[in-house]
Regions:
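Amphipathic alpha-helical assembly/interaction segments
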Residues: 1-115
Length: 115
């Protein structure tokens, strides 16, 4: 599992968020933090699930990954708009999310071609 590049990127994003993003949230915005944090872990879970399954089940979890990425993108955008996180941290998260999104799209296209 550690050889999967997407998995490693997601682990890096969770680690980065633990160090730099989660600490920025105040008690007023704790709900946004919890949703962001949950979606990160759902993304990791769906990556593992899609890697261990095959066929239509794999496609389902890959689509779930894309949904998780979109929601994480929305939540981090809200945090930036509310000035909870700094621009450089926002950029790091968005760049990482874009890499994960592109890899997930490519992975799903490869699976579609194998059918």
């Amino acid at each position: 599992m550690n050889e999967l590049v997407i998995f490693n990127k997601i682990k890096w994003l969770i680690s980065y968020s633990d160090k730099y993003v989660f600490n920025s949230f105040t008690k007023v915005h704790i709900n946004l933090k919890i949703r962001y944090q949950d979606r990160l872990y759902f993304l990791l879970e769906n990556c593992i699930r899609s890697n261990t399954n095959i066929g239509n089940i794999r496609v389902k979890y890959q689509k779930e990954m894309l949904i998780d990425i979109s929601l994480i993108d929305y939540y981090i955008g809200e945090a930036y708009d509310k000035k909870i996180i700094k621009k450089n941290r926002f950029s790091s998260v968005i760049n990482s999310l874009n890499e994960i999104r592109k890899m997930t799209y490519s992975w799903s296209i490869i699976n579609e071609e194998k059918k």
